């Protein structure tokens, strides 16, 4: 959850509350100041009666200190995150295809995620020493040097929005439909703290022009800003899009935002999108990527509330194909899938595969499709029982070929095309 948790495939969720020690009265067995059953032998036989009477209070004070220390530890956040098994649920419940929603689904394709949680001191000890089904990362390794927790969550939702578009494009293209897209701007993906952008822009907004000159892509933005020196005041046309309360990307109106360019911390040479390298001396302080507007011949809507990250791409692609294919893709099997996808149907590696394997087993999957590369296949095999058959794939075509061998059926152009609205 992209796909880095609120579930993530992504997004962070509150750390689980660790079990608390019992109150002092329970630990002693009695609360009347006398010796608890089974503790009398702990009192030295030669001790005075005063010593014997005070012993429960000494233990009570010790337990109180332990409880207090546990409470403090449970409320101190530390710069570590944990990835734990999340859920695995039928992907068809997230997908709407009005032209095909009357088809009965045979079997299930499961979308799986993980939970990404920031740790407190007590939870860190629990996951480090008492639970082997997790991965712990430092905030530096997971977020990077300058990404805040809230920005990390927003980036996960942006990855999911892109994954939905790519999954739809890959699915429809495989089924024989014609799919096109248009570059419409430079999406603000990250913001450098203390930069000019930090005062003016927000993650998920889209820059469409600089001083009135259109910037329809990341490359266009780089080229436009390259013309100006540090200290120059420019006006950015910014679509004020955002992430809503359920993690969905929402477009907004365009506003004009004045920004004074700063001197780049270090002059950097940029390979200008296939053109000659250019040296940047001024910067606005953002990480950007090209925002695309997709034209689909079939109306497909994907609702993945509060799930972030890119790794649901393969599952969503298969789910869309299954919807349009009459629900016959799995051959009646319960099939789980994870993997990042591009618009061409290529599948690349994701995180949390070991934890996802645990989640899909718990959900009853018998087949698990994972990316073949970067250790994903090995991670899944290391956690899978003999009842879960793991297959590594690099493309949607390979995934479909495996499902066909297992009894699934795929056709092309299964429903008449109708422009999405």
Annotate each predicted stretch with a short phrase:
Residues 1-55, 136-137, 146:
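Terminal targeting segments of Actinobacterial cell-envelope proteins
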Residues 57-76:
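Hydrophobic membrane-insertion alpha-helices, especially the h-region
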Residues 82-105, 109-116, 139-192, 265-337:
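PDZ/PDZ-like peptide-tail recognition elements
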Residues 170-203, 409-421:
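PDZ/PDZ-like groove recognition
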Residues 197-220, 239, 357, 361-370:
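Conserved PDZ fold ligand-binding element
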Residues 223-280, 382-405, 412-420:
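PDZ-domain C-terminal substructure recognizer with occasional recognition of PDZ-binding tails
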Residues 310, 318, 323-326, 331, ...:
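Glycine- and Gly-Pro-enriched alpha-helical subdomains that act as flexible
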Residues 371-383:
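Short, glycine/polar-rich helix-capping loops at beta-to-alpha or helix-loop-helix junctions
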